[in-house]
Structures are given as C-alpha cells and as structure tokens.
C-alpha cells in the first residue's frame, strides 16, 4: 500500500526535529502550537482506522489518546464482510486474517444450561450454514472473521503510523475552538503535565464519548479468563440460559461466554441490577463465577481481568458541526448484540475520510462533508435499533422455555425440564423454542444489515429513479444492485493470469467508472474530465480482448446497465451515479455529475 506525502501545512513557526520522508515530527513553536491537517481524538476502531485511511490518502494527521496504549480488553470481535472489504482496500486484510479466528471456525452459537452442561439449542452463525455460506461468498471477496479489538487496533494503528500518522499516547483532549480556517485544540501531555495547542484544519472526535443521560445506561460486567474448554464448547459464542448457583450478581438468567482465542481464552458477560451498587470482585470470586458458568467445579482458571461497561440506545442525528466531525461510539451507542459496534465505527471513518481527503486536496468544496451526516446518521439509527432489537429477541426464548418468572434455581431447572416431556405442553414448548431460536438469524445471519447499506444524499444522483424493491427480507439477505447509493456489487474479473474483484480495481483513493467495449467513449471522456476537475478518476472497460474481462459473466448479470452504459463508483465503493446507455455528450454528462453532486462546489474548475 502506497501513501503520498502531503506538505500542505502552514509553514511559519514550524519546528521540525525529524523528517522520515513520510511525516515531519514537530515540536510546539514559539506560540506553543503544533499544526496538522486533521487531528483525531481517540485510538479505538474509529480513530485508528481514520488515521490509517487519511495517511493512505496522503493527508497529514495526528492521533491522540489519553491512554498509554490501545484496548486492553477484547471488547469488539466480530468483523463483518463490509468491514473486511474496507480493510482489504486499505491493504491490511492479510494482516488481520493472520491474527483472526477464520470464518470456518466461527461455527455455531450454542444455547446451554452451562458450558459443560445440557444443550438447549444451537444456530449456525455468521454465514457458516451451507446455504448462507454461498450467499456470503457470492456477495463479497472477503469473509467475516473473529478478531478481538486488542489485536485489531494495533494492526490499524501500526499501518497508520507507518504511512505517516503522528500517534501521541498519554495525550488528553481538553477543549477546542473553531473558526473559518481551522480548529484549535487544547491538549495535555499526561506524562509531563504540559498543555499545548494542536491547530488542525479538521477535528475528528472518535473517543467513544459516554452518554449524559443516566436513564439510558445499564450496567454489565466482563470477566476475561483463560481455561482450556475445547472439550466442551468449541464455538465462538455460547449464551448460557440458567441460574448457576452461588452467583450473587445476575441479570435474569442470561449469560454469555465468548471465545477470545480458540479455545483457551474467554470472556464472560453478564448483567447486574443498575439500581444497586456495581459489584466488586476479587479473583477468587471471579474464578468461582467462571466455574459455575462452565459447570466444572475444579476447572483450572486464570483470571485476566474484569471491567464494567454500559448498554445504551442512542444515536446522533447530526454528526458534524463546522470543522468538527464525530465517528464511532461517540455517535451510536448500543448493546454488543449483532457485533455492529466496531464495524460501524470503521465504516463511519471510511465514509468520512475520503471526503476529507477530497476537500483537503482542493478537489471538492466543504459541502461534500455535509453528506457525511446525511449518509451515516440514518445508518447509526438503523444499527442502534437493530442491536437493541437483537437483544430483546432473547425474551421469546425464555418465554418458550417457561422460565421467565422463575425466582430460584430449583424452580428454573424444573421448568426448563418441561421442554423434554412427552406431552402436549412439552411439544408446544419445543415448537416455540425452535421458532425463537430461528428468529435469532436476525442477529447472527443478517447479511443484509451488514452490507446492504444505502446512502441518499447530494453525493448520489439517482436521476429521479426509485430504489428497486427488495425481493427478500432486507435484514437477512443482500440484494445486489448498481442503483446509486448502494454498495458496488462484487464480481470476479481478471484475465488469463489473475483474478480480482470489482472492489479490488475500484480503489479507495480515487473515483472509478465501469463500462463495456461499446462504452469506450465514457473512458475517453473520463481522462478529460479528470484533467478539468483535477481529480483522480480511473476508467475500467470490461470485455473480451480488454485488459479486464468478465471471467464468469457475473458482472454482465449484475451491472443493470447496457454495455455502452456507465457506472460511477465513489472511493468508498458506493455507486454515485449510472447511465443506462451512451449519451450524446459523455464528457459533459460525467463532468456535470462529478462537479455538481459527487464533488460539490469545486473551488475552481478548468474549462
């Protein structure tokens, strides 16, 4: 992955102490100010990915975090197809897969009384069931994987820093002011106690700000531990439906045991009553909780840590104020159900950073940044609603088992056993349980939610057309289409020597047009339009005898335009515009689209 050096900074007063050819390291000047194009606050998934995307585009940036290092607990882990496509585009897919639990081991989600106890039911998850696996493989060049945040963050941070990001640990954001030229951010070096100012053209808040509304916060607790459980539960997630004895802190009858590393590092998640004081644990109590959960009294357990966190049901309706944009948990807070948190955070940054790059390179006016809120705020609402919906969908499982009102362990076990009876009531409970478990596909096999995102903004031109109606459940299934606003469909292209995806040749650093052999005039026009607008615009002509060929005919079946039509793909691989067939003046058509909508208010256009 290559990067471009960018020296487009205010030079007076700079005090450069080291320049490695990618990024110059400054000390505060005589006015105690350090300058950069973009300041990123926070090094989590949103922050570290934003730094990586910007540095890949050649945009100078500083990333600060008040902490000494990256995430110290596993936290997020499911990395869905859309995020893996983005990491593939950033050139780090192989690095991620080298550390991740691969897709084929993500396996089943098992519901059980305890991990070594009786199984209640299971569902194949994350596209591992054969029919759904085909859906996943046909939709994308990348498959989901399971990588803890403790391993993913350092990969993104390393690549960001190698490409030019200045990373400042133990540096705390204090406040900011902004004007029509930039943002002045007051920060604190927590090691020296020195306060200084970072002057940036734009500020990204990716520090996972907590909600101020106490009523929206619920308490949950994690215990991270090591134990060899390969004999009992070789699966990535095990909801434990029970009342393990001697556990004092519980949120009624639902626990989760999550695999961190196969099969000897795990994370226990359970709830406590937020009307009471938060629980205080020591290692001995934590070990006993783990043993009760697993159902093995003499299990050898090493406690790695425990931490509190909160559930929320919140999303922002506007993500930007002037030159300050927010991303990640700062704009959407929700339960971990469905694994949408870190995925959405990285996707926020992906959407924002190509727009920042266009503006900072002089290829677009600042109005383009307004489309960040227009496009991503509805996604924030969608994923918060879906995550909370997935969490609430556990109640029908308890209702089917008849244990919702159980108050003691004996009563719980007695009611749980009724599902096995040879009786009409037993049959009713079994049928209700199966229906409730099947409904969990909306959490664990919701490919449409994960990659079917649609953008409707001034950076998308539909020419008055309506989005095609879905023929299947839009949350469970992904429907491929080149309709503007949707994600570019995946198809395998190539030649006799190599094979690559449509996503691979529509790089995230430029706009791309796709056309066929009889659409060569579009490709010729693209060269002239790129020169007039001063942008990087790539033309791909697909067909027999061309450098790029439709190997299996998949692109022909998915493109939805004639061979002489054209599809404009934005740097984030969403369709910006399409024309069904050739027009009388392709250069004017392409110029008007790019200058008027996808890149609004270009300061100076070369006619």
Curated annotation (Swiss-Prot):
Descriptive protein name: Phenol 2-monooxygenase
Pathway: Aromatic compound metabolism; phenol degradation
GO biological process, one term: phenol-containing compound catabolic process
Organism: Pseudomonas sp. (strain EST1001)
One protein family per Pfam: Rng_hyd_C
InterPro entries for this protein: FAD-bd (IPR002938), FAD/NAD-bd_sf (IPR036188), RIFMO-like (IPR050641)
GO molecular function: FAD binding; phenol 2-monooxygenase activity
Superkingdom to which the source organism belongs: Bacteria
Region (Disordered) residue spans: 1-28
Residues the entry annotates as binding FAD: 37-66, 319-329
Lineage: Bacteria, Pseudomonadati, Pseudomonadota
Catalytic activity as recorded in UniProt: phenol + NADPH + O2 + H(+) = catechol + NADP(+) + H2O
Listed transmembrane segments: none
Enzyme Commission number: 1.14.13.7
Gene3D superfamilies named in the record: 3.40.30.120, D-Amino Acid Oxidase, subunit A, domain 2 (3.30.9.10), FAD/NAD(P)-binding domain (3.50.50.60)
Record's keyword terms, sorted: Aromatic hydrocarbons catabolism, FAD, Flavoprotein, Monooxygenase, NADP, Oxidoreductase, Plasmid
Cofactor requirement: FAD
Similarity comment: family membership: Belongs to the PheA/TfdB FAD monooxygenase family.
